[in-house]
Each structure stands twice: as C-alpha cells, then as structure tokens.
Amino acid sequence: MMDSPKKLGYHMPAEYEPHHGTLMIWPTRPGSWPFQGKAAKRAFTQIIETIAEGERVYLLVEQAYLSEAQSYLGDKVVYLDIPTNDAWARDTGPTILVNDKGKKLAVDWAFNAWGGTYDGLYQDYEEDDQVASRFAEALERPVYDAKPFVLEGGAIHSDGQGTILVTESCLLSPGRNPNLTKEEIENTLLESLGAEKVIWLPYGIYQDETNEHVDNVAAFVGPAELVLAWTDDENDPQYAMSKADLELLEQETDAKGCHFTIHKLPIPAVRQVVTEEDLPGYIYEEGEEKRYAGERLAASYVNFYIANKAVLVPQFEDVNDQVALDILSKCFPDRKVVGIPARDILLGGGNIHCITQQIPE
C-alpha cells in the first residue's frame, strides 16, 4: 500500500497556476452528442485551438476517429489512442498533483458514470474508469490508486494552498460512496489531494445531472477569491441554492484563515432547454439516460476553463454572456478572456470545464 499523496508531500495546484498542458477527449458518443456530434466537434475544435496557443493539448481519440479529428485539428494536438466511453476529461482523467521538487503524481479515482447503478448516466463505463491510469502511463507519471473511492474531477476545486471546495449534493449522493461518512469522505480528500481543509457547499446548479458538481457553481479565481453562480430571480429554484452557498461562503475561511472575496456570476437570463429539434439527433444505448423536450440544462458561466494564456467562458446567446465576460476579465487581468459558443457542449450534459483537465507544470 502506497503512502497517501499528502504523506508523500504532494498537493493539488490551483487551475490558475502554470500548466504543462491540457487533457481532452474527442466527442463521439451518440447518446451524448446529437447528429454525429458535428456541432460539438466544431466547439471542441475552437476550444482546443484557443488552449493550444499557450500549452500542449493531449487529445484522446480512438483509431477509428483519428482521421476525422486530424481533419479538424491537424498537428495542433498530441493524439493518444486511449479508448473512452465519452468525452468528459474533467471527470475521467487523472487529478495530477505536484510536490515541491516539481515531481508529479496522478490520482486515479474510481469512476461510475456519476452514480453507478443508483443513478449513473450510462451503464458501461469500463473504458472511462481506465482513462486516468492509461493517460498517466502514456505521460510516464506515477499513479496513486485511490480506488474504490468514487470521485470525478468536476466535483473538486483547489486553491493550491490547502483548500478544497466541494458540494454536499454530489459527494454525499447515494451513488458515489454510500458506505462512507461525511468525515471519512473528507479525510480521503485531504489525504489524496494533500490538502488541509474541505469546504462543503450545500448545492450546485439546479438539475445538474452530475448531482451538482462544484465546477458548475463556484470556482477559485485566486487565493481567497471565488466566483459563485447567481440569480436574483427568487422564483428560480437556483436562487435558494446559490443563496445557501453564499451564506456558507461568507462565514467560511480558507485553509490559511482568510475570508473570501466572492464575485456573483449571473446564470443565463433565459433558461437553456432541450428542444424538439435536438431530440432526433441522439442515439442511445440500453440503460442510458435520455433527453426530453423542454428539459432544463444546467447552464452556468462558472463552467469556464483557465488555460495558461486564456480563460475560456461558455456563451449562450444570452444577455448575460457579456456580463460574465466582463466580470471574469476583471478577475483575470493577465489572461485573454474568450467567449466560446457552448450550447452544443451543454447538450451533451456539461460544459467547457467538464471537457478539459489541466496537467500542472
């Protein structure tokens, strides 16, 4: 049994610290990406090209789709033939830690498609569960095997200084680690991520099918500084959820004892929903969660990704698109803040942060 990463002197850096690169996966799952994923592939391409201006992008793509991916991306990425069940690199990729000598360690969590037999979104996730270890092997990085502890990368945020941010709705959901107490889950996080403190937000984004991942509702933009998804519409179920999160954060301090500066990031003014026109594009396998017309999608500008030279922010053709860009431009004065049309990623069930995973420098 290997010592825990914490005992070995490793910790999880913040996303805004320097990257060696970013991991992504080419979107091909017919039950996630409608109409052969054509629109999604264009969106992924724009994201990859933007990230690649400042760091290496590793793209997992199976041999059958390699020539297609190359037709979009040419030599802008490093292609790796690693099989997957879907394209959520944030959730299936490794969480890569560093120590003070600059050595890296990849944490491999158990993945069960956001809830396994209890409320998972698809039943065959065998390949996804191997992505983290296979990618670490390709990078020749040592692996810390955290299995059978179930976790996705989108369920944790780190400030790089000992603080981990999570939601209770996700980490305490019955489909993850039902046999562990909250205290046991917290201790596992602290040991596996080399952290000092876990902050438990009550909620994420309304109807987020990941059981409300933290990366859709709140994110660190600097030490003791956060953005929080927000709405002033008291009739929207999101209002009470964000309000509860805000009240908790206002009382909390980070691992160093500092109070937080909190920036409210509005959610889109118009609700993003699945339309009748979207539905014929999906092809499901048995046991896979199906979309329905009018289904509210968990749209949030908080699902941005911080790359070395840019911050990539979802856009929804909404009046709040520019508001979100303006707020984040103030948070990241040294980076280009880039809006990316993101509805076609949202139709898959996540957004820009969900399809990216940073590899620290």
UniProtKB/Swiss-Prot annotation:
Keywords: Hydrolase. GO terms for molecular function: agmatine deiminase activity; protein-arginine deiminase activity. It holds the Pfam family PAD_porph. GO terms for biological process: putrescine biosynthetic process. It catalyses: agmatine + H2O = N-carbamoylputrescine + NH4(+). Its EC number is 3.5.3.12. The keyword Hydrolase applies. InterPro entries: Agmatine_deiminase, Peptidyl-Arg-deiminase_porph. It is an enzyme of class 3 (hydrolase). The active site is at 354 (amidino-cysteine intermediate). Belongs to the agmatine deiminase family. This is Putative agmatine deiminase. It comes from Streptococcus pneumoniae serotype 4 (strain ATCC BAA-334 / TIGR4).
